[in-house]
Amino acid sequence: MKIVIASSHGYKIRETKTFLKQLGSFDIFSLTDFPNYYAPKEVGSLPEENALAKGLHAARELNSWVIADDTMLMVPALNGLPGKLSATFAGEDACDKDHRKKLLQEMQSLESIVDRSAYFECCIVLASPEGKFFKTRGICEGYISHQEKGSSGFGYDSLFLKYDYKQTFAELSEDIKNQVSHRAKALQKLAPYLQDLLEKQLVSRN
């Protein structure tokens, strides 16, 4: 079964590919295989709004089942920021390091773990060319470190510590992160829908 990962981000593609290969026999592609495809601009205030828009658009344009996701980092003490600005917190043209630096600056007066609490929210959408879709949600709670730690991952990983771990996401091995992260939780909830699609395809072939 052909399925397209609606992302050109190497880490997201790798994590989703690993998950799909464990489930069954998929012909896996990503947006890197479609250089002429243009994704819609993310304008939603919630992860599910962006994931749904990306998924339905890509499925229709590429004529394939698609997996799309959107993730936001929420810091309650900052009224939910970065939130929908997670990818542009320090500006449209800023890099991940700039976003992390701005977050640390915004939180410099917050000392306790309670005040520095944060969570990642991820929504994943499985969409068909006909407009059918299934969506799942994963949340990972933790807090923001006072300084960057670790060199793996991307985005805010080097600042985020999951409550029951003493390492940031950027310090965890990729295998462990892929089991406990917000995206991992959302992908795991998607498994029954994908397995059902595979079974239906096998039946139709027979």
UniProtKB/Swiss-Prot annotation:
Matches recorded under PANTHER family: INOSINE TRIPHOSPHATE PYROPHOSPHATASE (PTHR11067:SF9), INOSINE TRIPHOSPHATE PYROPHOSPHATASE/HAM1 PROTEIN (PTHR11067)
Residues engaged in binding substrate: 7-12, 71, 154-157, 177, 182-183
Superkingdom assignment: Bacteria
Protein name: dITP/XTP pyrophosphatase
Family: Belongs to the HAM1 NTPase family.
The protein's Enzyme Commission number: 3.6.1.66
UniProt function note: Pyrophosphatase that catalyzes the hydrolysis of nucleoside triphosphates to their monophosphate derivatives, with a high preference for the non-canonical purine nucleotides XTP (xanthosine triphosphate), dITP (deoxyinosine triphosphate) and ITP. Seems to function as a house-cleaning enzyme that removes non-canonical purine nucleotides from the nucleotide pool, thus preventing their incorporation into DNA/RNA and avoiding chromosomal lesions.
Source organism phylogeny: Bacteria, Pseudomonadati, Chlamydiota, Chlamydiia, Chlamydiales
